[in-house]
């Protein structure tokens, strides 16, 4: 376990939380954007973050880690690599070159559609879905729906940050999807 400068053991969750920058009024007034770039710039923080996810899923017998476009693409492939499983991209509409399945959803500030290659996984494959944060839960729910339409077993939804006041993690859990997040922030 890492230690703080005082020699006390470092709480990995508190450390991860401290490495996330809040940008007020971005991308629109009233939104408190949780910026993970500061977390990713720190080799120590990135290692701790990846280790938290790997420790959680090392015995989950996964076949894939699916990442949600776009910030889910940052952490999901690293976790997939560390777990020696494949990575499945779930992209914004029009970005995948092969035959796709699509799903539309509502998000914190608008609506969108995501797609997955129709051969991204096969029936019975065990998958987790990853993103940087859970706000309204729409993106992750759409990803889950796509994976399940392909026959995959979605083991859990995972994110660095939960914004519980926006209700997404509760929505996902109420829909039967277990959710794991490293930290949470109140408000938007």
From Swiss-Prot:
Tell me which InterPro entries the record gives. Ade_phspho_trans (IPR005764), Adenine_PRTase (IPR050120), PRibTrfase_dom (IPR000836), PRTase-like (IPR029057)
Cellular component aspect of the GO annotation: cytoplasm
In Gene Ontology terms, what is a biological process of this protein?
A: purine ribonucleoside salvage
Q: Which SUPFAM superfamilies match?
A: PRTase-like (SSF53271)
Annotated pathway, please?
Purine metabolism; AMP biosynthesis via salvage pathway; AMP from adenine: step 1/1
Q: Does the keyword Transferase apply?
A: yes
- Keywords on this record? Cytoplasm, Glycosyltransferase, Purine salvage, Transferase
According to its UniProt record, where is this protein mainly located? cytoplasm
Q: Write out the catalysed reaction.
A: AMP + diphosphate = 5-phospho-alpha-D-ribose 1-diphosphate + adenine
Subunit structure, as described in the record: Homodimer.
What is the annotated role of this protein in its UniProt record?
A: Catalyzes a salvage reaction resulting in the formation of AMP, that is energically less costly than de novo synthesis.
> What is this protein's name?
Adenine phosphoribosyltransferase
Organism for this UniProt entry: Burkholderia multivorans (strain ATCC 17616 / 249)
């Amino acid at each position: 376990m890492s230690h703080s400068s005082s020699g006390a053991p470092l709480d990995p969750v508190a450390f991860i939380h401290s490495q996330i920058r809040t940008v007020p009024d971005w991308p629109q007034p009233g939104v408190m954007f949780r910026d993970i770039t500061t977390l990713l710039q720190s080799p120590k923080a990135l290692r701790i973050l990846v280790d938290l996810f790997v420790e959680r899923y090392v015995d989950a017998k996964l076949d894939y880690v699916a990442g949600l476009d776009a910030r889910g693409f940052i952490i999901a492939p690293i976790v997939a690599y560390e777990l020696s499983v494949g990575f499945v991209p779930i992209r914004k509409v029009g970005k995948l070159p092969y035959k796709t399945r699509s799903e539309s959803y509502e998000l914190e500030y608008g609506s969108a559609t995501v797609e997955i290659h129709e051969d991204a996984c096969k029936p019975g494959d065990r998958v987790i879905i990853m993103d940087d944060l859970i706000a309204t839960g729409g993106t992750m729910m759409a990803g889950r729906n796509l994976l399940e339409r392909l026959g995959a077993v979605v083991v859990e939804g995972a994110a660095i940050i939960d914004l519980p006041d926006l209700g997404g993690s509760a929505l996902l859990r109420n829909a039967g999807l277990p959710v794991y997040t490293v930290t949470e922030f109140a408000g938007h």
